[in-house]
Amino acid sequence: MEEVEISTEKKSNPVKSFIAGGVGGMCNVLVGHPLDTIKVRLQTMPTPPPGQPPRYKGVIDCAARTFRYEGFRGFYRGISAPLVGVTPIYAVDFAVYAAGKRLFQTDDHIRLTYPQIFAAGALAGVCSALVTVPTDRIKVLLQTQTVSNGPLLYNGTIDTAAKLYRQGGIRSLFKGTCACILRDSPTGFYFVTYEFLQELARKKSANGKISTTSTILSGGTAGIVFWTLAVPFDVLKSRLQSAPEGTYKHGIRSVFRNLMATEGPKALFRGILPILLRAFPSTAAVFFGVELTNDLLKA
């Protein structure tokens, strides 16, 4: 079984990881939100009537239309929800990951196996998903309402949260919880990929230190691995969270059946191009922010 040496001081302090994760999460949103908006709009556009073209022809067309009708601000529509929620989401993710690794560590330089890293990462994914759901629900509604045929129903994050609560209570805010947990279930692969590449960079380094470039490359690659596995669940989540109440009576199962019946398996990968285009820079930004904060806290 392959093992990787991870310092408890640097990698497995839940309190420091909580702070570093929050900073990394904010870096993620600032870098990745424009492509996230395009991704959500492609995933949630309705099936066109027979003989009619789809609302968007692809990533470039969606980006061009967004800029033409909404300007630069259109790409950052709904950003306040993830920015407000991103600190606890990523803070929980990295804190639980650190706590999970600590469970396997008995001293400051215990060698963890990759299955142990995977287990800690998977646990972190489930816990952070529970925090993610309300902000994801609000973000998706704000990102998609401007391209619907009806009037604007929501005016910002607080207004959306208040209206959702009035409509269906806490349950409405947490619509799509199961789908979100499934979407974040590959988090174990995310952390394994990152730790493996960082350890590889450390071994190849003359002084045993990891450069900023290595952190960016490792983080970006981890993001691509994660999202390649998560895309189908993300499509189902976006469809469910953007649909009017009562559209899918059995939740994610109803979304899946409807999607297969009307659009086929190909629809599960709708929006994959902007997802993968966004995955590298946004995830690289996460780990850059995390490692920079870890270094500052260690100083």
Curated annotation (Swiss-Prot):
Coiled coil: none annotated. Its main location: mitochondrion. Disruption phenotype: RNAi-mediated knockdown results in accumulation of magnesium ions in mitochondria, and reduced lifespan. A magnesium-deficient diet rescues the reduced lifespan phenotype. GO terms for cellular component: mitochondrial envelope; mitochondrial inner membrane. The chain crosses the membrane at residues 79-99, 114-134, 216-236, 272-292. SUPFAM superfamilies: Mitochondrial carrier (SSF103506). One of its GO terms (biological process) is carnitine transmembrane transport. Pfam families: Mito_carr (PF00153). It is found in: Mitochondrion membrane. Keywords: Magnesium, Membrane, Mitochondrion, Repeat, Transmembrane, Transmembrane helix, Transport. Belongs to the mitochondrial carrier (TC 2.A.29) family. Mediates efflux of magnesium ions from mitochondria, suggesting a role in magnesium homeostasis. This is Mitochondrial magnesium exporter 1. The lineage of its organism: Eukaryota, Metazoa, Ecdysozoa, Arthropoda, Hexapoda.
